[in-house]
Regions:
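Glycine/proline-rich active-site loop of Rossmann-fold NAD(P)-dependent oxidoreductases
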Residues: 90, 102-104, 115-124, 158-168
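C-terminal amphipathic/interface module of NAD(P)-dependent oxidoreductases
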Residues: 212-246
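Glycine-rich "substrate-gating" loop/helix at the edge of Rossmann-like oxidoreductase active sites
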Residues: 80-85, 112-119, 139-147
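NAD(P)H-binding glycine-rich loop region in Rossmannoid oxidoreductase-like domains
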Residues: 1-37
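Alpha-helical substrate-binding/gating segment
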Residues: 126-134, 142-176
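Conserved Rossmann-fold NAD(P)-dependent oxidoreductase catalytic core, especially the SDR/UDP-sugar
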Residues: 40-82
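Mid/C-terminal beta-alpha module of Rossmann-like enzyme folds, strongest
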Residues: 162-209, 242-245
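Conserved beta-loop-beta element that borders a ligand/cofactor-binding pocket
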Residues: 60, 94-117
């Protein structure tokens, strides 16, 4: 119903099937099409009905960046990962950029690991802790760029209210290693006796190609969104976990 766009100035796009599923051919198609085709359909409907908007802000992912234990990644990074999810993100952002013909401003938010009490990566990390132990991936040295769900929600609103455009990283200012990620959660949760490393081979056997995302090391910068005037309510990982689990 095109009437749903009556008096709408801005659109926030969060559509897309979960990437945390076995990457079969069918699931790969679902992951890609749920992001790209939904945007293309929306754009075509707006064009056909002569609807102009002030802005669109669309989700994307930090999976666009390569993997590195040393390098910090900014929005201007030109190097890209060479695997399925990076290809999806390329097409996803291309579909978002196509809105430039009908929107005054187009923005993309490359989102990190979203922490929430409603599920996702935090719930998955805590599952083995119910049995008294936590696990980290391989060496545990890989960087993980995370963000509290409240902060990522506010970033989208901040971009619209401040009439921003372009690409922004949706991550908190203080990324941590996978080992520290697991250790801090286990300490806040309590009753976790020990944490153990699980070798990459195990995850490859269980998850297939999808295991790659568990071992990506991406230390992503939040400076650009901060320089635009955004203030994080949850910049610290431990206080974030305490807030969510309280």
């Amino acid at each position: 119903d095109i009437n749903c766009f009556h008096e709408i100035d801005s659109i926030i796009n969060l559509s897309g099937a979960s990437i945390f599923r076995i990457w079969t051919k069918k699931n790969k198609e679902l992951i890609l099409k749920s992001r790209v085709q939904s945007l293309n359909f929306l754009r075509e409907q707006l064009i056909e009905n002569g609807v102009k908007i002030q802005s669109i802000v669309s989700a994307s992912g930090i999976g666009a960046y390569p993997s590195s234990d040393e390098k910090e990644f900014y929005e201007t990074e030109s190097d890209r990962s060479n695997y399925f999810l990076a290809d999806v993100i390329k097409e996803w952002e291309k579909a978002t950029s196509s809105f430039e013909i009908i929107a005054e401003r187009v923005s993309i938010v490359r989102i990190g690991l979203v922490l929430s009490s409603m599920g996702g990566v935090l719930k998955q990390t805590m599952q083995p802790m119910s049995f008294g132990f936590g696990v980290y991936f391989g060496s545990g040295r890989q960087w993980q760029s995370w963000i509290h769900i409240n902060d990522i929600s506010q970033i989208f609103i901040h971009i619209i209210k401040n009439r921003l455009s372009g690409i922004y990283n949706g991550v908190a200012p203080n990324p941590i290693t996978n080992y520290e990620f697991t250790k801090i959660i286990s300490r806040v949760r309590k009753f976790v006796l020990f944490i153990i490393p699980v070798p990459r081979l195990f995850f490859r056997l269980i998850f297939g190609e999808m295991h790659i995302i568990l071992f990506k090391s991406q230390r992503v910068s939040s400076k650009k969104i901060e320089q635009s005037g955004f203030n994080f309510k949850f910049p610290n990982f431990r206080s974030t976990i305490e807030n969510i689990l309280s």
